[in-house]
Curated annotation (Swiss-Prot):
PROSITE patterns: HAMP, HIS_KIN. Residues 150-358 form the Histidine kinase domain. It comes from Pectobacterium parmentieri. The gene is pmrB. The chain crosses the membrane at residues 15-35, 66-86. This is Sensor histidine kinase PmrB. One of its GO terms (cellular component) is plasma membrane. Its main location: membrane. Its EC number is 2.7.13.3.
Length: 364
């Protein structure tokens, strides 16, 4: 422990040593120059062989050299001091730059402790404090995920019991409970999505990822299911897909859930016999787009629509968690979710920008 404490230096100490070294070097240059000029002047005074005219000429020359000996070293020292101070500050603040790069390159889900790479006391203290903050945030997020999983798990059994009771009540008393049963089914589906999101979210935080081929593992397995869903309202599903597949780090099940929720949201808010277009762009990054032909959205409330329990229109079914789950899945994949109106014609445009291993976009 004693050796470690002695190895740790202070930023203030480094700054004082650097400035002290700069001042010492500049002062030595000035002293050497003045000593050289003083030696010439003393030699002139003791030289008796010079005539009066020669002495006056030499005196004038020495005066000019004395002025130059004061002004030129001062200018040189100012320039050298600025250059050396710049280099010293760069040397002292280099650990801060490394710390900034380490934090800037991190994703929102990466709460691993920062490595202690600096022997400067202040930098080590900041790194330790940030690591403590990461630990508290990680524990809070784990508690939130566990709470979500526990609540969702506790809701599954009573919801199944309520559904069974409604079916028996409908059979025995000839009462139409189909609308209530449909609501129960939607709640069960939402609970299962929350359970899935909580489980995979914990795996993501632990660093467990897999390589996902977006067309093969996400799009193709969902095409029949989504087409069957849209047939209930005679809606058409158009696919605009690239020829080549693209691979990213993530979870195929979560990405399928993201696609299902976006298409289901468009299906719910689009009129019958309308068209829903699903496009995948992989030129610069993975961008999934879902366009519908509904009434569009109020763009002043875009930030509210992706929050939990907020619905676009209370006339339609749903709990209001679909877009919130989409936002969370996009964040887990180091991506972003955007919702706006279509540029051409009525309808909404949902965009999910995801990252590939070699590309981290900053979408606007």
């Amino acid at each position: 422990m004693k050796g470690d404490s002695e190895a740790v230096t202070s930023m203030r100490r480094r700054l004082v040593l650097a400035l002290g070294g700069i001042l010492l070097v500049c002062q030595m240059i000035s002293v050497f120059w003045l000593w050289h000029e003083s030696e010439e002047q003393i030699g002139l005074l003791v030289d008796k062989s010079l005539s009066a005219a020669a002495q006056n000429m030499q005196i004038d020359q020495e005066i000019n050299e004395a002025i130059a000996s004061l002004s030129i070293p001062s200018l040189v020292m100012v320039i050298l001091t600025l250059l050396m101070c710049f280099q010293a500050v760069s040397w002292i603040t280099r650990p801060l730059s490394r710390l900034q790069e380490e934090l800037q390159d991190r994703t929102a889900e990466n709460l691993e402790p920062l490595p202690q790479q600096s022997d400067i006391k202040e930098i080590a203290a900041v790194t330790h404090t940030i690591n403590q903050l990461f630990q508290r945030l990680d524990e809070t997020l784990k508690r939130d995920r566990q709470f979500t999983a526990d609540v969702a798990h506790e809701l599954r059994t009573p919801l199944a019991g309520i559904r069974l009771h409604l079916e028996l009540h409908q059979q025995q008393h000839q009462i139409d409970c189909s609308s209530l049963i449909k609501r129960i089914d939607k709640m069960v589906k939402t609970v299962e999505q929350l359970l899935l999101l909580a489980r995979v979210g914990q795996e993501f935080s632990a660093g467990h990822h897999e390589n996902v081929a977006f067309l093969k593992d996400v799009i193709f397995p969902m095409q029949d299911e989504l087409a069957e869903m849209l047939q209930k309202r005679q809606q058409r599903l158009k696919w605009v897909l690239p020829q080549e597949d693209v691979t990213l780090h993530g979870d195929a099940t979560l990405l399928q859930l993201l696609l299902r929720n976006l298409v289901e949201n468009a299906y719910r808010y689009s009129p019958e016999t309308s068209q829903i277009t699903v496009s995948l762009n992989t030129q610069q990054h993975v961008e999934l787009q879902i366009e519908d032909e509904g009434q569009g959205i109020d763009e002043s409330k875009v930030g509210e629509l992706s929050k939990a329990f907020v619905r676009m229109d209370s006339r339609y079914g749903g709990i209001g968690l679909g877009l919130s789950i989409v936002t969370r899945i996009a964040q887990l994949h180091n991506g972003k979710f955007f919702l706006s109106n279509r540029p051409q014609g009525p309808g909404a445009l949902a965009r999910v920008v995801l990252t590939t291993p070699d590309n981290y976009p900053d979408a606007a």
